[in-house]
């Protein structure tokens, strides 16, 4: 029970299970794992796919002949295991050239380098069968406002994304581009901070239909926002192209904790939302094992992410099927035809009728919504004492 299978569409990045445990205050505590070994290990655990940055697979500066050998060896592992590569992304944050931005660098040569690196990563992803290209603007931010750069960066990023979308069309790549917001880190402030800001920006692009979102649990939580609401907004806009699942304590650095390890109630309602919405994309765990762990702990972390998701899925489905929950929700969502007749699309007649209508406000002011009981039922399902 709760055993992951490929049909659950769970994915991990090479950088997640491959995280060596380095942090700003300490060196690596684990050896780098061979990407081919990671592919075989994830397949053993029941994962659907593996995602990657360009440099996770091909170290920066690798000669072309060696690059081709690496790709052939990696593709062989994919063929042997059946694992997919649903998503790729370019590392536009590690190279010192990107210290003041990649697409938003004030130096046009750096912007050109970032764009070329992105095109090459798109080529790599196409070789591996990827259909989603994530753009994380981690270095696209500032600590100093004296430059006035905040007035210029939108044009630079728009230019780069429009170029990438046109390149994808010209090459016959079927990419959907998923933009990943984050409020800060590594920059003091990142220009594309939240799901809402990314949604607004997408509509300024030449091909907005090719662009959507890759929201991350930790990133919205860092800003003190409600991730379930952010994902619901992305779903409503038809823009949830990909999702990063992890966990996070509010107002901390980006912790990338094991999914469900901190905000269990939020994780419960996130799984409830994803599973009830018809979302068909990957469930990607952008997290990593604690620095305390050896390799065995890394795979315990990976198993834990998937197992927690499946437990929450089962608990959420049972919660929604509970007769008392259904009864409470039926009472919560009132469908009074007289009130509904005053709502909906505008007409002059409806506006006049609305102004004339006698609204039962006294009764509505006294109404109770039974949310305490409904929420308690959710808690009891989470605690495993009901259903």
From Swiss-Prot:
InterPro entries found in the cross-reference section: Xyl_isomerase-like_sf, Xyl_isomerase-like_TIM-brl, XylA_actinobac, Xylose_isomerase
Keyword Magnesium listed: yes
Keywords: Carbohydrate metabolism, Cytoplasm, Isomerase, Magnesium, Metal-binding, Xylose metabolism
Binding note for cofactor: Binds 2 magnesium ions per subunit.
Cross-referenced SUPFAM superfamilies: Xylose isomerase-like
Active site: 53, 56
E.C. code: 5.3.1.5
Localization of this protein: Cytoplasm
Cofactor: Mg(2+)
Family, per entry: Belongs to the xylose isomerase family.
Subunit structure: Homotetramer.
Name assigned to this protein: Xylose isomerase
Native organism: Thermus thermophilus (strain ATCC 27634 / DSM 579 / HB8)
Lineage of the species this protein comes from: Bacteria, Thermotogati, Deinococcota, Deinococci, Thermales
Gene name, Swiss-Prot/TrEMBL: xylA
């Amino acid at each position: 029970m709760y055993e992951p299978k490929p049909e659950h569409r769970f994915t991990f990045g090479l950088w997640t299970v491959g995280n060596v445990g380095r942090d700003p205050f300490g060196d690596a505590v684990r050896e780098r794992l061979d990407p081919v070994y990671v592919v075989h290990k994830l397949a053993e655990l029941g994962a659907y796919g593996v995602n990657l940055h360009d440099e996770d697979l091909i170290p920066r500066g690798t000669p072309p002949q060696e690059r081709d050998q690496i790709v052939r060896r990696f593709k062989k592992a994919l063929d042997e295991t059946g694992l997919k590569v649903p998503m790729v992304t370019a590392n536009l944050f590690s190279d010192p050239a990107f210290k003041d931005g990649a697409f938003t660098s004030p130096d046009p040569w750096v912007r050109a380098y970032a764009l070329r690196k992105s095109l090459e990563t798109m080529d790599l992803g196409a070789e591996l069968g990827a259909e989603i290209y994530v753009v994380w603007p981690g270095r696209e931010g500032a600590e100093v406002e004296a430059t006035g750069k905040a007035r210029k960066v939108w044009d630079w990023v728009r230019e780069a994304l429009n170029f990438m979308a046109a390149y994808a069309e010209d090459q016959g790549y079927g990419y959907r581009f998923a933009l990943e917001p984050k409020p800060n880190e590594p920059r003091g402030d990142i220009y594309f901070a939240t799901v809402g800001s990314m949604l607004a920006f997408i509509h300024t692009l030449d091909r907005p239909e090719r662009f959507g979102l890759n929201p991350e649990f930790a990133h919205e939580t860092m800003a003190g926002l409600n991730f379930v609401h952010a994902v619901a907004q992305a779903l409503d806009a038809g823009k949830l192209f990909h999702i990063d699942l992890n966990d996070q304590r509010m107002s901390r650095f980006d912790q990338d904790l094991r999914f469900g390890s901190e905000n269990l109630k939020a994780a419960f309602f996130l799984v409830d939302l994803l599973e009830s919405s018809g979302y068909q994309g990957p469930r990607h765990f952008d997290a990593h094992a604690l620095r305390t762990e050896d390799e065995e702990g890394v795979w315990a972390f990976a198993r834990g992410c998937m197992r927690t998701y499946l437990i929450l899925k089962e608990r959420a489905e049972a919660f929604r099927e509970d007769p008392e929950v259904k009864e409470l929700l039926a009472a919560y969502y009132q469908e009074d035809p007289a009130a509904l007749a005053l709502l909906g699309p505008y007409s002059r007649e409806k506006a006049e009728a609305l102004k004339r209508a006698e609204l039962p406000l006294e009764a509505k002011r006294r109404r109770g919504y039974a949310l305490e009981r409904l929420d308690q039922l959710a808690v009891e399902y989470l605690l495993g004492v009901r259903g």
